[in-house]
Amino acid sequence: MAEAKVLSGAGLRGQVAGQTALSTVGQAGAGLTYRGYDVRDLAADAEFEEVAYLLLYGELPSKAQLADYQRKLGKLRDLPPALKEVLERIPADAHPMDVMRTGCSFLGNIEPEKDFSEQRDKTDRLLAAFPAIMCYWYRYSHDGKRIDCTSDEPTIGGHFLHLLHGKKPSELHVKVMNVSLILYAEHEFNASTFTARVCASTLSDLYSCVTAAIGSLRGPLHGGANEAAMEMIERFSSPEEAVKGTLGMLERKDKIMGFGHAIYKDSDPRNEVIKGWSKKLADEVGDKVLFPVSEAIDKTMWEQKKLFPNADFYHASAYHFMGIPTKLFTPIFVCSRLTGWAAHVFEQRANNRIIRPSAEYVGVEQRKFVPIERR
């Protein structure tokens, strides 16, 4: 038997754990691509549903295919009464990611994936239902309202905003949500995606794979960076105060979320896109504090540590300007990244072998058992 290769590096940094045709991350001259398309081009000119179709079905849709796909998703938005009842029983102080996890798992009980031929239809069902799962629980637990889980909004981003606020969203807000969902849709073998692939490699059902991925994203070292960034940004009332506060945090070696990346070395290509849209939202509402504070923190982190903002940092202010509660930031990530998770599940299933690495043992040497009477 060939000697097993011992992997080095905390968190398996730099190790290749498999093959994918879905995305590239951090390659020179590319930054981030989905099936060969630069994410910046997709964010500029595509609908999120086009990107979802690209990831899940393999190619960008034609105009007719996109219209059919959006109609299909529109018909799948409502929630079963039993799921609404479950969501009503979840308290307002529950972690929203727990709500998403429970909603996904319960839907898998009443609308199961009977075999793998249903994988795309079940993914489309989750893609259509996730905004309603999040908003139905939030509006019921916080406002006491049983909302209509359907809307005439053609896009998932517009539908989410409509359910959350109970009214038709502005064109600018719909555009920004569309861009945000595209930017978060896929990102190679990140922790939650790899979790989904490990689960898929056992030939488990789609709902189990997605539920496992949600559980992984719930951890603060993976999801939640935009929430933590928002909480930090809101502490400061001016750019000057932000600079002083950031320097103090660096001196105390506090963790500052929203900066740096495990793969990108010089910049996160998603950041430049969402920063521009955050600025447009700031101008729309006449903001004179939040965006300048964000820029002050950004500049200080670069000057002091040469750390660049990742996709999460300016997402915080963008979501805030659209009236989205901070606690819902990471569940939005779920609504988007579902497309990447599911595409990886499909890919794993298509050429599967159970993922079962070995561990390097670092414990005590083999020893003789001593009966309890002699210990």
Q: Can you describe what each PLM-predicted range is?
A:
Residues 1-375:
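Non-transmembrane, aqueous-exposed alpha-helical and coiled segments at domain scale
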